[in-house]
Design a protein with these regions (language model features):
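Conserved ABC transporter NBD signature motif
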Residues: 58-72
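ABC ATPase "signature
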Residues: 208-209
Length: 232
């Protein structure tokens, strides 16, 4: 099967510091991939370049056979690692904005997910907790019929009780002809839903592997394996 998301020799430098250094990988449709690594390993930089928000120093990102640009923004649904909407917006304002910007946005689905999470349409973003803001942004992101979903730390600010709902939302709201990549530090919570992992360190790919293959090879969970790989 042809890859839907390809990264070739991707490098991003800030002065003498390389946030990414020759990153290569490919992801096929139907895969849910964990992008894993310690702080400063390049996860957010990779996602921002893939979402068209940063320019690389070298290399390329191909999404649905097209280099990152105007077209790929239309087929990529990106969840940033922090609130990207004005704090004076209400949840209804946010839904309307997404409906205006993205032709693949399902307003009915978004409102249903927000209601499930007890987020009212008139609730202002500025009055929401960090966890509620993240849940709202996830609902918006997953209400698009995208080809590629990029979720940067979707579980970072939510309480443990909400994580199962969020994982269920992720699993049930992307199709088999799409791919989804999420970055997280909470591998123990999401390992059960991942198909593959990509391990980053110091801006380089240490490894890309199927989760089942990694478990069989090491005889331990991915969480335990990562603790060994990234131990100080």
């Amino acid at each position: 099967m042809d890859a839907i998301y390809e990264v070739h020799g991707l490098t991003k430098r800030y002065g003498r510091t390389a946030a990414l250094n020759g990153v290569d990988f490919a992801v096929t449709p139907g895969k849910l991939v964990g992008l894993l690594g310690p702080n400063g390993s390049g996860k957010t930089t990779l996602m921002k370049i893939s979402a068209g928000l940063l320019q690389p120093t070298a290399g390329s990102v191909i999404i649905d056979k097209v280099p990152v640009g105007v077209f790929t923004k239309a087929v990529t649904s990106y969840l940033p690692d922090r609130m990207a909407l004005p704090t004076e917006f209400t949840a209804d304002d946010a839904v309307s904005l997404y409906a205006d910007f993205f032709t693949d946005f399902d307003k009915v689905k978004a409102n249903a997910m927000l209601a499930d999470l007890h987020i009212g349409g008139r609730d202002k973003i500025g009055s929401m907790s960090k966890g509620t803001q993240e849940k709202m942004q996830l609902c918006l992101t997953m209400s698009r019929a995208a080809r590629l979903y990029l979720l940067d730390e979707p579980l970072g600010g939510v309480d443990p009780a909400a994580r199962d709902y969020i994982l269920s939302t992720i699993l049930h709201n992307y199709s088999e002809d799409a791919a989804l990549m999420l970055s997280t530090h909470l591998i123990g919570d999401i390992e059960k839903v991942l198909d593959e992992v990509i391990l980053l360190q110091d801006g380089k790919v240490l490894r890309q592997a199927a989760v089942d293959e990694l478990r069989e090879e090491t005889g331990e969970s991915v969480d335990a394996y990562l603790r060994e790989v990234y131990k100080c």
